[in-house]
Amino acid sequence: MNTRKEELQDRAIVRIAAHLPDLIVYGDFSPQRPSVDYFDGVLMFVDISGFTAMTEKFSTAMYMDRGAEQLVEILNYYISAIVEKVLIFGGDILKFAGDALLALWKVERKQLKNIITVVIKCSLEIHGLFGTQESEEGLDIRVKIGLAAGHISMLVFGDETRNHFLVIGQAVDDVRLAQNMARMNDVILSPNCWQLCDRSMIEIERIPDQRAVKVNFLKPPPSFNFDEFFNKCMTFMDYYPSGDHKNLLRLACMLESDPDLELSLQKYVMESILKQIDDKQLRGYLSELRPVTIVFVNLMFQDQNKAEVIGSAIQDACVHISSVLKVFRGQINKVFMFDKGCSFLCVFGFPGEKAPDEVTHALESAVDIFDFCSQVHKIHTVSIGVASGIVFCGIVGHTVRHEYTVIGQKVNIAARMMMYYPGIVTCDSVTYNGSNLPPYFFKELPKKLMKGVGDSGPVYQCLGLNEKVMFGMAYLTCNRNEGYPLLGRDKEIKYFMCTMKEFLMSNCSRVLMYEGLSGFGKSRILMEIEYLAQGENHRTIAIALTKVSFHQNFYTIQILMANVLGLDTCKHYKERQTNLQNKVKTLLDEKFHCLLNDIFHVQFPISREISKMSTFRKQKQLEALFMKILEQTVKEERIIFIIDEAQFVDYASWIFMEKLIRTVPIFIIMSLSPFTEIPCAAASAIMKNRNTTYVTLGAVQPNDIRNKVCLDLNVSSIPKELDLYLVEGSCGIPFYCEELVKNLDHHRVLVFQQMETEEKTKVTWNNLFKNFIKPTEEFKMSGLGNEEGTEEICKLASGVRLKNLSPPASLKEISLVQLDSMSLSHQMLVRCAAIIGLTFTTELLFEILPCWNMKMMIKALATLVESNIFDCFRDGKDLRLALKQNAASFEVHNRSLSLQPTEGIAHGEEEELRELESEVIECHIIRFCKPMMQKTAYELWLKDQKKAMHLKCARFLEENAHRCDHCRSGDFIPYHHFTVDIRLNTLDMDTIKKMATSHGFETEEEIKISRAGIPKNSELFSENLSPEEIGERILGFFDVILTKMKTSKEDIIPLESCQCEEILEIVILPLAQHFLALGENNKALYYFLEITSAYLTLGDNYMAYMYLNEGERLLKTLKKEKSWSQTFESATFYSLKGQVCFNMGQMVLAKKMLRKALKLLNRIFPYNLISLFLHTHMEKNRHFHYVTQQAQESSPPGKKRLAHLYQQTACFSLLWQIYSLNYFFHHKYYGHLAAMMELNTALETQNDFQIIKAYLDYAMYHHLAGYQGVWFKYEVKAMEQIFNLPLKGEGIEIVAYVAGKLSYIKLMMGYLDLAIELGARAHKMWALLQNPNQHYVVLCRLSKSLFLKNRYKHLIQMLRRLWDLSVAEGHIISKAFFYLVCLDIMLYSGFVYRTFEECLEFIIQNEDNRILKFQSGLLLGLYSSIAIWYGRLQEWDNFYVFSNRAKTLVSRRTPTILYYDGVSRYMEGQVLQLQKQIEEQSETAQDSGVELLKSLESLVAQNTTGPVFYPRLYHLMAYICILMGDGQNCDLFLNTALKLSEIQGNVLEKCWLNMSKEWWYSNCTLTEDQWLHTILSLPAWEKIVSGKVNIHDVQKNKFLMRVNILDNPF
């Protein structure tokens, strides 16, 4: 039975009937319109307060999760309760109007007395519902009820597509008046109702000076049985459910199918509702908080109450209103009698109906409706209120009776303006500002205090939309601000400068057209051009058109000529007339002067000839006259005519301009939005003219967006997070950027404060990334920054999550216009894509699209790519490349395009779409062009639908949420998924096998791979070989492996390179967000930790930090649920925090985090010396145990144990490096213990890779500490371990890793020849293994070794490879290192590979790159090198700029070769500064010298500074000594440096040392600009290769450090 009932209730007719009252559903009406029906009844008007305030609260909410749906739930919770009461008591809900409803009890007149009692009982029970409740949102919901009874008329009216009905009569007026009198929780009876009711049953209270009364309560006699009374009353109600249907709320729920009835009922329902009823996919689609424009029309009549009298007037008005709205996609939402009149609530921008220029169209419609209705007989006053903004549009009510309605402050404002400003068209300030119409179309009205809307801002009267020629008012709309430059538009201005030059030098016309969408800053460009175009021999005329200009014949030329003739400054028509007479007397006979009357608003007497002339002839005469005037004018001065919004140029003006540019030399500059329809022939001819330059505007680049934000906010820097949000969200469109900033400011997200000095702030995790992005250099040089000392910075308010912010209403509107212009199926695709995220794969989209086939999807995607909704990319690399730059402006060659045959064009379009389809098939990554579209489309979903879609996405993505096949599909955090149960899908055996092998469990087959030709370790290290021989054998082993890799037929080498970065971006990042949306916090945390680990692998410390913060938020919420897995997650969390701090050079913080992680992993690291020695003793025993037991096979640890061990190894590996950085003697014991604990933990894992890494780390620790015997032993152990590995997959990677790591150790220790040999082999291996992340590291180190050996040929080869790799992979660190070596070559090798300017440009462009900025060492080296360059040139201002930037990075100490390389350069810069101080005989020179010497000595004394840096450091120490007159120590340091260079084979330093030695002790003096002469003569590498320059001569191009011992003041 229930199923049958559900089926019935799901019928289309039942769903339509739910939108209509029984009065219509069961009505019997004549087909003529208007038609009138009469009856008696009781009316109840219920007004619910609190909803508008709630709608406002939701519509201005910051975050996307507070959507329409939550609002619908709250609204309908209350309204459905009221509806239910009304239906139970036999009422019929006639209308819902926003937050009010009107109900009717239709009965014969004699039944009114009893029915009024029933209605009063119903009213009191409704009040009872709200007496005690308070909404969950903390809003007080209260109701006011008015009751009336008597004669009622019903009027049905409409056109052939849509019907409306109204109830009219005294009772309708009375019920509204009664409700108006009511206060909260009152029930008021109208005078007539009080007259007709059973007074004995009702206790009332009189209202002073009123005939209406207030009901206190019902007072039935003791014997009264209400149920019996009620049942008796209901027998008089025609459609009250009884008998079999007595349990139903409404009889209409059981309507049988009836096509005729269905057809007639459909006419009463809005088209969008019918669409939703037909298409079940769209359920819930119409409930939205969305920006709309409300047009409230009120008609007052001479004879108010007679339906038959006013019916025809309402019918005429309705037909006209409908026809006007249809043109602009507006809809009549409601019609009702309202305070002495009939009101139409019209809405523009309903779901599916959003159109561009909505506000303009609404005003245009309002004026049209006003003009028409004012002429209709019997209508004596027309008042219209127009307001724009966000309102709630949605279905409100109960499942059995509801309506589509709009609720919000803007609806109230429009209604109030309509009532308080009768007889005119009014609009609010939002509509005024958004109309893009000239101000003279409006007049600001005096403010009135309007009930219920508070201060709604200024109110304007719309005076009409006929363009009046207000001379001097059509100027450009924006004003140029001297202090506000045009940012990021140099290329566009260049087009103007070139065209201007051509125009001034030639005698023919030029046209420059800038085409761009709204918001691209076209008006700003023209404003700048107007300023630049000012000159002595030419006149500039600049005008801005509006939408209305298009409909005014010859308007553009009218304004141009008024300016040329100087009429724009005339105050009065007589002044204009005199001016015109003087200008045209020689060109035009006096009797023809009256031709100018209409066009220039003058009053010359009309001659007989002109009165006989046809309009066409008059126009031709005028055009001829204007042409003569312009020909005459250009002989005296050139004319530059600038037109903004040129898409609104009228047809006649285009024709004249086309003729004009052929006849008269004139320069026309236009900006225009893309034409919506094909432009007229004249406009096309201008675009195709050979002298036209047509530029399509591109977006502004990220750097300029940042500069713009700093300028708009008047700050010196903004947070990195804000920078990323604005760059991504604005897509380089200036208007988008402004709106986003306004929105943030509105929500108080931006906090401004004085800039703190670097020293003041103590480093904590929260301020670890003092990531303030400053404007670019060029911007600062333009002198627009703040004055020194008063610099303010912008910060984000705490706890703000930018990516969850709701888009600003203005941008939402733009997206909705685009969405609503699509077909329903395309809308559905975009909305589904929005759930997946900003970037998604075609596979996942196909998975979640309901009932689509692949062909349909590809076709739809191609169309959406063509209309710039989506971009498609072949792979992650293409995507990353595209995101770095925005599309720039470009020139369109319309002339060459026009030469194609027309049928070819149509064919070309089809061909283009086909090509796009095949491109989409090839590209599997799709991304929204604009993030705002994704956010807007996402917000349209209902909560349950969202959840279901997120779940689908999560299930699909989860299968691929691991490392790529190249990296053997493991977790980014080893064995992570074994410790935490997070999967939705149950694992199949294949997946488990795959994941197990990824962590180094070889299968039998893998071990049996042929190892022929590879020596066994017994063969390698059998006898007592010398270190040199062992070295040779090791190199031989690597050569054998390389040969095997190149020639083996087995699949040793992977088929493709590492795809982990792509998997991170398109699988794991979205998956974490899906779990977050599903409220699965533990799963989201798991993936946030994976993401962090992945970003650390990719060298992106900033993103790792951001996602750790996301994880921290979740950890706090999960802390309440104590479980073991959370302990592991916490440990991993601190371990990852430690890694980020370590990479950022914040060692105190890193140590704290790593200790916390170890504590959670049950491996406490000692805090005091007693505990230290105890632990050391234990670890030594443990090590001895592992070494002796190694021969015996013991069972490997379980997976969960392995997860712990891997984390412990990572922590210990960082800890020993941190302790090695410290000078205090006891720290070396801590360092040694950490290194040993790492080794023992690795041995426990029984994993070859872990053991080998630990052996090499242990060797490295002893290398740096200077224990020769120990390090050698462990390097040999590591080698022995790799001989036993299977040469496949991970085995080969371990071999490559060992070669690279040994090469690094040898470079640090200064064994340059061995470093090069090992590095070359490692480079070849990683190249074959296609692992760019490892490959670039080896190439960088190899380049460094070759550079120190002066092996330039090989060096340049490696640099080329490094460059190719950096370009192919879009890899910033390898590119930065490339430029670092290029600077080195110029500074120390004496030739040029890439120019200094190119290197400097790279640094300026990329210093804010998030990977480079937070990578310790590289930027320090680059800044220091530039500082050295300027220091050598004695350009001290530039030196200080870069030296100070380097200084801020020195404190980020990390024990890496890059950091020490950077520090040694920084010290060199400081030494040059010291030399300047000594020369200037500065008082602080002596102290500075001593301080510098100490710093250099401590660097040499530090364990972690590799010996490879000693020669340079001793060289600098020697220079300081000679500057300070300490010859003895100078000799000592010089000789030490020379000796070390000799031992290491450091040819570069040795050569420079010898030159310094010779120079310092000679009597020669140095010219001031010696380095300038040197750099001017630096040869390019090409000259050296071609033999034009001898390589030995090049070595003399070294900087000679200036000394002047004779004048030494010390």
UniProtKB/Swiss-Prot annotation:
This is Adenylate cyclase type 10. It is found in: Cell membrane; Cytoplasm, Cytoskeleton; Cytoplasm, Perinuclear region; Nucleus. It comes from the Eukaryota. Its main location: membrane. It catalyses: ATP = 3',5'-cyclic AMP + diphosphate. The N-terminal guanylate cyclase domains are required for enzyme activity. Fragments containing the first 470 amino acid residues are fully active. ATP binds at residues 47-52, 99, 144, 406, 412-416. Activated by manganese or magnesium ions. In the presence of magnesium ions, the enzyme is activated by bicarbonate. Calcium mildly increases the enzyme activity, also in the presence of magnesium ions. It comes from Oryctolagus cuniculus (Rabbit). Mg(2+) 2 binds at residues 47-48, 99. The keyword Membrane applies. Its EC number is 4.6.1.1. GO terms for cellular component: cilium; cytoskeleton; extracellular region; nucleus; perinuclear region of cytoplasm; plasma membrane. Pfam families: Guanylate_cyc. Belongs to the adenylyl cyclase class-4/guanylyl cyclase family. Keywords: ATP-binding, cAMP biosynthesis, Cell membrane, Cell projection, Cytoplasm, Cytoskeleton, Lyase, Magnesium, Membrane, Metal-binding, Nucleotide-binding, Nucleus, Repeat. The lineage of its organism: Eukaryota, Metazoa, Chordata, Craniata, Vertebrata. One of its GO terms (molecular function) is adenylate cyclase activity. It is a peripheral membrane protein. Its cofactor is Mg(2+); Mn(2+).
